[in-house]
A protein has these predicted regions:
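Glycine-rich phosphate/adenosyl-contacting loop at the front of the ribokinase-like
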Residues: 1-63, 70-74, 256, 321-322
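Conserved beta-alpha-beta core of the PfkB/ribokinase-like small-molecule kinase fold
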Residues: 136-216, 235-236
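Conserved phosphate-binding/catalytic region of the ribokinase-like
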Residues: 2-9, 34, 158-161, 207-322
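Active-site metal-binding loops of divalent metal-dependent hydrolases
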Residues: 14, 142, 264
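Conserved N-terminal subdomain of the carbohydrate kinase-like
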Residues: 29-34, 40, 55-139, 311-322
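Structural alpha-helical scaffold elements that stabilize or flank donor/cofactor-binding regions
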Residues: 129-130, 187-188, 221
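Short, conserved phosphate/pyrophosphate- and ester-handling motifs at nucleotide-, phospho-/glycolipid
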Residues: 53, 198, 262
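Hydrophobic beta-strand scaffold residues
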Residues: 60, 86, 166-167, 228
Length: 322
C-alpha cells in the first residue's frame, strides 16, 4: 500500500468543524436551543476527503494549512496520520459550525480564518512530482481559499506538468454564482480531468434549471477523455465521458449527518479510478462510500480501513446505463 500513498493528492480547505443537531425550524433571535447530538472533528472538504480515503483503506497526501493557535495545533494532530503536510498561517484557524436540520439539510457558519491566507507560494514547495503511472490530484474548497484561488489556473498547469491528472470539486461559492464567476470556473473545468459537482452546482454553473440540459451544456466544456460526475444526493450519481452517460443509484441508508457526503463520494470515486475502474463502476464506488460514511455518527467511530470492503469491484450488471 505504500506506493498508493502518493497516487492521490488532496489540496484544499481544512478547518475545525462542530456539527450539531437536529433542529426543526430556525431559533428565535436571543434564545437558546438544546440539541441531542454533536461532534467536534477535523473538517473542510479536503480533510473530509482524506478521512474518507482512510476509512476506505486507502492512502493520500493532504496539502493544506492551519492557523497558529490551539485549534490549529489540534487540527494538525488530527490530520498528521493521514499523510498531511500543513503550512502554518499567521492567522486564527478557520472554524465551522454545521447545523443539521430535521429535514436532513444542513446550514454552515464558517469563519474566514487561516484559509484566507493559504497561498500557492505556501503550497508549491510541498508539492512533489506525481508517482509513476496513474496519479490524481483532487482540488476542493477553492472559494474558501481566495489567495490560492487567484493562482488556480497556474496550480492546475503545474499539477499537469508534474504528472497528475486533476480532479476538481469547486463546492458552493459563498458569494453565489455570477456570470464572471462562471467564466472563471469554466477555465478550470476545461483543464480538469475529473469534474465532481453536485446537482445544484451543475445547474448553477450551467445557469440552467433543468439538470439534463445543464449536463448537456457542461460536457462540451470538458477536454477529451475528461469525466463529469454529478452527485444527486440520495438518488445517486450521473456520469458523462466522451459521449457515454450512465447513472448509478445510491444505497439506501438512514442518515443524520450529511456533512461531507460529496467529499466521501469523491474519495470512493477517485480510489476506484486509481484501481482501474471505468466510469460506471467508479460512480457506484462513490455512491457506496458516501452512503456508508454519512450513515455513521459520530464519524470518529470509523477506524482507518474500517470500510475497506467497499472498494471491492462490483459486477457491471448492478449499474444502470442511460
Amino acid at each position: 500500500m505504500r506506493g498508493e500513498q502518493h497516487r492521490l493528492t488532496i489540496i484544499g480547505d481544512v478547518g475545525v468543524d462542530l456539527v450539531l443537531g437536529p433542529i426543526s425550524g430556525w431559533p428565535r433571535v436571543g434564545t437558546e436551543t438544546l440539541v441531542e447530538r454533536s461532534e467536534l472533528r477535523a473538517g473542510g472538504s479536503a480533510a473530509n476527503a482524506a478521512l474518507a480515503v482512510s476509512y476506505l483503506g486507502g492512502h493520500s497526501q493532504l496539502l493544506s494549512a492551519v492557523g497558529n493557535d490551539e485549534p490549529g495545533a489540534w487540527l494538525d494532530g488530527q490530520l498528521r496520520t493521514l499523510g498531511a503536510s500543513l503550512s502554518v498561517c499567521d492567522a486564527p484557524t478557520t472554524l465551522s459550525v454545521g447545523l443539521i436540520h430535521s429535514c436532513g439539510e444542513r446550514t454552515f457558519f464558517t469563519t474566514r480564518g487561516h484559509l484566507d491566507a493559504f497561498s500557492y507560494e505556501m503550497l508549491r514547495p510541498r508539492l512533489p512530482p506525481a508517482a509513476p503511472g496513474n496519479s490524481i490530484a483532487l482540488l476542493s474548497g477553492v472559494f474558501l481559499t481566495p489567495v490560492l484561488r487567484a493562482s488556480y489556473s497556474l496550480l492546475i498547469r503545474e499539477l499537469h506538468s508534474l504528472g497528475y491528472r486533476v480532479a476538481l470539486d469547486t463546492n458552493w461559492p459563498p458569494q453565489d454564482w455570477t456570470g464572471a464567476l462562471r467564466a472563471e470556473v469554466a477555465t478550470w473545468v476545461s483543464a480538469s480531468d475529473h469534474l465532481l459537482l453536485n446537482e445544484l452546482e451543475v445547474r448553477s454553473l450551467a445557469d440552467m434549471a433543468d439538470l439534463d440540459a445543464a449536463i448537456a451544456r457542461l460536457t462540451p466544456m470538458l477536454k477529451r477523455g475528461a469525466t463529469l460526475a454529478v452527485k444527486t444526493g440520495a438518488r445517486g450519481a450521473i456520469g458523462a465521458q466522451d459521449g457515454e452517460r450512465c447513472e448509478c443509484a445510491a444505497p439506501q441508508a438512514i442518515i443524520f449527518d450529511t456533512v461531507g457526503a460529496g467529499d466521501s463520494f469523491n474519495a470512493g470515486y477517485l480510489l476506484a479510478r486509481l484501481d482501474g475502474a471505468g466510469l460506471a463502476e467508479s460512480l457506484a464506488a462513490g455512491c457506496r462510500s458516501a452512503s456508508a460514511i454519512i450513515a455513521r455518527f459520530p464519524r470518529r467511530a470509523i477506524a482507518a480501513g474500517g470500510l475497506s470492503a467497499l472498494r471491492a469491484r462490483l459486477p457491471l450488471g448492478a449499474l444502470e446505463p442511460v
